[in-house]
Structures are given as structure tokens and as C-alpha cells.
Regions:
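Low-complexity basic/metal-binding stretches
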Residues: 23-24
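Extracellular/periplasmic, surface-exposed regions of secreted and cell-surface proteins
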Residues: 1-19, 31-244
Length: 244
């Protein structure tokens, strides 16, 4: 059997705000008076998943199952903000920022992608002896080169004891008894920003900085330091159980 599923979403936002000379509530700290601001944002995301399964038997006693999965996810967010202070006319609000005495423009784009492959193999003999092995290969865009991809295997064994011939005498009061054990590795990429592995640089303008007696109007400084060693968080798990 084969199944495919595609989901997506689009988003758009626009907001304009004007603070007159007598309005100070929630006005940005860097803003003069009067002050106007316009904000625009666009976003989209989609996920595409595919599942392919195949089951077959040999001599009615040996049952096999193979399942393959792929998943692709992409998210993108873009924004543009523009500010202006010192407009001559209130009626201009945020529609004529070029007429402001000072302007400020900010924009940004954040894009992330995730890709996953998974393969699972099941085998059972007469429904009594069960074996499962699976492996996931996950990749994300926001880890450093060489650490974007990792593998997460898992396996399990089970024995349906109640189907054995020596359990016939107890089937009236114990008709289901299964022992199982499993182990595997799981991965976690949550909590990491889209560009956390990169060092950010910013331009500082303000009134300039003096270096060796000279005013440098535009300077660049380092923001958040990136961590190129960031990679997948792994958890090693095992379990044992008795089902009755």
C-alpha cells in the first residue's frame, strides 16, 4: 500500500501604528514624537509525507512486513518594519514615512527545513516469535555542516508464551501472556534557533564611535556567538515488559 499526504499554510500580516505628540503609551523607546510605524509579515509552511508498506507470508508460518517513510518539512517567515519620527502633519500617519525627520528600516528572513527517512522491518513466526527493527535518518538545516544528519536505530523482540503447547493447561485462566524487550535511540533537535550555529554581525550607527580620535559613523559588532558544535541530542532507551 502507498499513501502520500501534503499539507501547507500561508500567512500574511500588516499593521500600521501612529503615535501623536500627546500619545506615549507603548511607543518604542527609540522613537521621537510624533512617530509612525508600519509592519508587514509573510509566512508559509508545508509538509509532505509518503508511506509505502508491503506485507507477505511464506508457507503461512513466516510473516514479513516492510514499511518505508519519507517526510519533508519547510518553514519560512519574512518581515519588514519601517519607522519614522517627526512628521509635520498627523494626517500622513504611516503612509508618508519619507517625510519624517528620521527613518528606521528593519527586515529579516528565517527559513528552516527538516528531512526524514525511516525504514521498518517486521517478522513473526507463527505469531509466537516477533521481531522488529527500524531506523530513522533525520536531517535539519539549522545544525552545522557535518552534524545536520544523524541515524536513530531501534529494535524489539517479543515471545507470545501463551501460544506454546506447554501453556494449554492454563489457557482457561491465562489466555494471553507475552514477554517483550526493546532498545533504541531517539533524537531531538528542538530548542535550537534557525541560525544558532552562526555568529551574527550587526551594524551600529547612532552618533558614531571615536577610534584614535576619528569618528567612525558606521561600525560593526558581533552579536550572538554561534556554536558550530551543536548537533542532535540523543537519548538511549530500553524497556522490558510482560503483557497479560
Amino acid at each position: 500500500s502507498y499513501r502520500t499526504q501534503l499539507n501547507g499554510s500561508l500567512g500574511h500580516g500588516r499593521q500600521g501604528t501612529y503615535w501623536g505628540n500627546l500619545c506615549h503609551a507603548n511607543r518604542p523607546t527609540y522613537a521621537g514624537s510624533p512617530h509612525a510605524q508600519i509592519q508587514n509579515s509573510d509566512s508559509y509552511s508545508y509538509t509532505w509525507e509518503n508511506i509505502l508498506s508491503y506485507n507477505f507470508s511464506i508457507a503461512n508460518d513466516h510473516n514479513f512486513g516492510v514499511t518505508g517513510v519519507t517526510s519533508w518539512q519547510k518553514n519560512s517567515n519574512e518581515y519588514t518594519n519601517a519607522d519614522g519620527s517627526g512628521q509635520d502633519l498627523d494626517i500622513w500617519k504611516y503612509w508618508r514615512l519619507l517625510a519624517a525627520n528620521s527613518q528606521r528600516i528593519e527586515s529579516g528572513l528565517t527559513t528552516t527545513q527538516k528531512m526524514s527517512y525511516a525504514l521498518r522491518f517486521n517478522y513473526s513466526y507463527k505469531g509466537k516469535y516477533l521481531f522488529t527493527f527500524s531506523n530513522r535518518w533525520d536531517g535539519v538545516s539549522f545544525f552545522s555542516p557535518g552534524k545536520k544528519w544523524d541515524s536513530f536505530p531501534a529494535g524489539a523482540l517479543a515471545w507470545r508464551v501463551s501460544d506454546e503447547s506447554f501453556m494449554k493447561s492454563s489457557e482457561k485462566w491465562l489466555d494471553n501472556l507475552k514477554l517483550r524487550v526493546g532498545a533504541g535511540i531517539t533524537g531531538n533537535s528542538g530548542g535550537v534557533g534557525a541560525y544558532s550555529t552562526q555568529t551574527n554581525a550587526y551594524k551600529y550607527t547612532s552618533a558614531g564611535i571615536t577610534i584614535n580620535g576619528n569618528i567612525v559613523p558606521f561600525t560593526q559588532y558581533t552579536g550572538t556567538y554561534g556554536s558550530p558544535s551543536l548537533g542532535w541530542e540523543k537519548s538511549y532507551n530500553w524497556n522490558f515488559g510482560i503483557d497479560m
